[in-house]
């Protein structure tokens, strides 16, 4: 069973706190904006400073702009029929800031500056909320203290297959020498939020207000995750404004399973997007549930978070932050072994009921550095295609490679425009008669959308599939790869993260062509040492010997030349084993450890330093290859079949003409199974088409003219020679000479002619209305099965052999993406 975390709140022990825990001690303050000396208007917009007086003391708030909303962020309403309707929200995406009070270095400020200041000021051990006084003409704001200390509950329940081992692993991870020298790099966690009807009603039943509150919560979350250089990007908000789509009552794990099942079946939910359902309950028994370390596993990218009646906005932001931390693989803090700069750190179970600054502890930071170097969090590195660009107020952003309303195209900034003949990079408009100006499926020379079937993204691995243009849009089809733990390499290995995890291949990539995977004795000797050259992210169990450091055979007399790793050589049983240690912990993936998904036993693979059963990690899937793909394909990461050559999607039906593929690769379009497959050639240039057509048509016209002349001559010759042929028939048989043989079965209306001097053999089976002619000097053999209305002619001196048996059309795709016909 995968590790499932339930964040429980035993609110039966809660001291009654009334309707709201925000006990306001109201103050009136007038924030003063300080002009900066920055001349650049754009740069000045990204940094602002305000002075706010709290209890008579002035605090200087130094703020920088936050960018955590997707450029195409939107709010959607789902009605009773399940239809998703866009709501055109007036939420402004350019006025969210975070920073600190200059007078208190250990402080955090998260504000929206549109129409006044709204947000939180977390000053050491006290938190203030600030909002504009709507009726004030002098920019007055109300300031109030926020308290959560009325809440008293134990927030954590764990469901691990081996809780003792997990605890031990955590203690090892928080040792200061582990990852202390590594540097974090920018990462993005993309998330979609769904709000149930009770939560919507609690927030006022007004879409604009609910949207603003959710955005405000994610402003707080991003302030906390900025310490890890992590942006939690809010992609969209969906509101169940009329009726819930699942039953939200019951135990935490039951609700989570129902939500995960609904998400997997809902076409609008992308499998790779992590999605959270926000629920409201007056007195729940828990405040959240999610899967541990599954942020990049599309089968488990879901969670639920409950907003109790007595929890403030700040506390709910901490609940979500803890759940997201669990998604990333973090554990709750051991307060006796972790250093916390403030009074309470984010992954401390008691953080939900405390006020003031919230940061990640030394344990969480070191643990995240370790996790970030592992392949299970590779999806967080994808920051290029949808990297957030702050949009100017009132419009889209021209030059960010994103096609937004009202842009006609977007080829990037002028100096690096990718489609200079098609798109004007200054105003993002199409040039002249251009049909497109953005994306890999827009031809840069003709400015037209490429035809269906053109290769636009090559395969990188046998577990990564090629994508093609679909002939309708200028963008390439979404990147598809094999679902995790699908078989590869002739079923000797498994796919994981779009790569076939073969131990021999990892050894070759790590040490060179003379390295290969180890046996048990070699791996045991090295990995049980529990040093920097041999460990399993901690001490190895005997069952996980193959899941620690990559220990390889070295079959070469020279030492390994590398500047990236320290290499250890172990002589054992007449053979040399090598393992490595990454010298510089830079936040990149540490490939000296065995990759997740690598085989470690029969039906077992490595996962986070342990050897687990494949069926346990796979769980229940929407796509099972043996059933859905009929044994002639594997499942991709979108739960569709990737079919073998000779079998056609979506269900891998036998189709000899099919090159294989899936319904997601861009080439295949939805079709009726009764409709024959017709493929078109792509990629031929206009001049080449004319030239090829000329060379094809010219011989055809010559042959056609020659046929007409020869047919006339043939008829005359036939009349002259037919009587002679009959006269000599008996004489020829008596001489034992070779004669034309005609075998015909069930044929009607046949016109056959042979000419003296030729050797002809014909076989017709069920053919009707046939017309054949041979001319002198030719050796001809024809065989037709089930064909009707055929007309053939051979020319003198030719050797001809035809056989037609309803052979299907065949299509192949070369590397350059152009089709070839055979």
From Swiss-Prot:
Gene3D superfamilies: Collagenase (Catalytic Domain) (3.40.390.10), Disintegrin domain (4.10.70.10). Residues 1-16 form the signal peptide. SMART domains: ACR, DISIN. One of its GO terms (cellular component) is protein-containing complex. Keywords: Cell membrane, Disulfide bond, EGF-like domain, Membrane, Signal, Transmembrane, Transmembrane helix. Residues 187-384 form the Peptidase M12B domain. GO terms for molecular function: metalloendopeptidase activity. Disulfide bonds join 296-379, 338-363, 340-345, 456-476, 623-635, 629-641, 643-652. GO terms for biological process: binding of sperm to zona pellucida; fertilization; flagellated sperm motility; gene expression; positive regulation of gene expression; proteolysis; regulation of mRNA processing; single fertilization. The chain crosses the membrane at residues 689-709. Expressed in sperm (at protein level). Its main location: membrane. Residues 619-653 form the EGF-like domain. Involved in fertilization by controlling sperm migration into the oviduct. Promotes the binding of sperm to the oocyte zona pellucida. This is A disintegrin and metallopeptidase domain 3. It comes from Mus musculus (Mouse). The gene is Adam3.
